[in-house]
């Protein structure tokens, strides 16, 4: 507790006046409050007067600077907390810097470890090989396309289905035709679409794969995209100006396949991009005929309505 001794002239006021110090730095001005309280409610009257100096004493903690004679707020620890916060922020920054350095060191160490492993693996494998096997390996510094390919099993098609994009690029860079076909006259793009490998599809198209080539049955990549329900692939193929009305050997267009698979979204996309509703298959079927053949159910009605009311090329 802080004790104070204050001398008040008796003629000034009948009620005791309590000194209220300014919370920051009051010099020699004291604000007095004349207060009366009735059950917790008070009426305060403020007045300012200049009085003589008073002396504050505190046996445990001095809180008065005697030279300037003013109240001093007790230390609430706020400055210390701010200092700690600053230290913590500095610590966080240092930790981030250290972590970044650690990541760089770790990355370099990982690359070094990988290089060392590859060298050790090469030495180990060459020791395991028979002399004639070692000769074959030494003769094929680049991929031997004839040795790794048959008419049924083409390396590019296999890698497309297994999503080995880097190895695909390696073969293409070493002379393999990106549109190389297998016994079914299907390219790697055909296979990727059938397997719904969207990343491979995009990569092959960017590398120059032909999206118009038809396989042994006359099916183009868009036929297979519609068949497997790959809506995003269908949209992507339209960006490469594929023929929406291309027909296979039996006269089936992508629209016929979309209705057969009862895929409303793809049917609508095809119609939006100019699919011809009047095109017939070689046995005379319209896309509408295929929709009616499924009987009376919701999807049939939905497709029939779409085919009846939506003009070709409507957006």
Swiss-Prot record:
Residues 72-104 have a biased composition (Acidic residues). It comes from the Eukaryota. InterPro entries: Ankyrin_rpt, Ankyrin_rpt-contain_sf. The keyword Manganese does not apply. Expressed in roots, inflorescence stems, flowers, siliques, dry seeds and mature cauline leaves. The keyword Lyase does not apply. Residues 44-65 have a biased composition (Polar residues). It is found in: Plastid, Chloroplast. ANK repeats lie at residues 151-180, 184-213, 217-246, 250-279, 283-307. One of its GO terms (cellular component) is chloroplast. Keywords: ANK repeat, Chloroplast, Plastid, Repeat, Transit peptide. Residues 1-39 form a transit peptide. PROSITE patterns: ANK_REP_REGION, ANK_REPEAT. Residues 44-106 are annotated as: Disordered. One of its GO terms (molecular function) is molecular condensate scaffold activity. Involved in the initial differentiation of the proplastid during the embryo development. Also required for correct cotyledon, true leaf and cauline leaf margin development. Interacts with AKR. No homodimerization observed. This is Ankyrin repeat domain-containing protein EMB506, chloroplastic. It comes from Arabidopsis thaliana (Mouse-ear cress). The lineage of its organism: Eukaryota, Viridiplantae, Streptophyta, Embryophyta, Tracheophyta. The gene is EMB506.
């Amino acid at each position: 507790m802080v004790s104070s001794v204050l001398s008040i002239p008796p003629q000034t006021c009948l009620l005791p006046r309590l000194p209220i110090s300014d919370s920051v730095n009051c010099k020699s001005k004291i604000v007095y409050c004349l207060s009366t309280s009735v059950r917790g409610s008070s009426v305060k009257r403020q007045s300012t007067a200049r009085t003589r100096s008073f002396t504050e004493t505190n046996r445990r903690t001095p809180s008065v600077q005697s030279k300037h004679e003013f109240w001093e707020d007790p230390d609430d620890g706020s400055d210390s907390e701010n200092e700690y916060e600053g230290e913590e922020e500095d610590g966080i920054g240092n930790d981030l810097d250290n972590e970044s350095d650690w990541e760089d060191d770790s990355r370099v160490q990982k690359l070094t470890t990988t290089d060392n492993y590859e060298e050790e693996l090469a030495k180990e494998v060459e020791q395991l090989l028979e002399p004639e096997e070692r000769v074959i390996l030494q003769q094929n510094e680049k991929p031997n396309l004839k040795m790794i390919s048959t008419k049924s099993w083409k390396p590019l098609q296999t890698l497309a289905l297994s999503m080995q994009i880097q190895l695909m690029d390696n073969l293409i860079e070493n002379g393999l035709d990106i549109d190389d076909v297998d016994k079914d006259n299907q390219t790697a793009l055909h296979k990727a679409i059938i397997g719904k490998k969207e990343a491979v599809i995009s990569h092959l198209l960017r590398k120059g794969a032909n999206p118009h080539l038809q396989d042994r049955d006359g099916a183009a990549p868009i036929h297979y995209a519609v068949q497997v329900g790959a809506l995003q692939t269908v949209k992507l193929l339209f960006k490469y100006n594929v023929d929406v009305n291309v027909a296979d050997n039996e006269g089936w267009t992508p629209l016929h396949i979309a209705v057969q698979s009862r895929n409303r979204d793809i049917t609508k996309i095809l119609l939006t991009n100019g699919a011809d509703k009047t095109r017939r298959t070689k046995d005379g079927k319209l896309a509408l005929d295929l929709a009616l053949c499924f009987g009376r159910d919701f999807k049939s009605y939905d497709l029939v309505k779409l085919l009846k009311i939506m003009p070709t090329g409507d957006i």
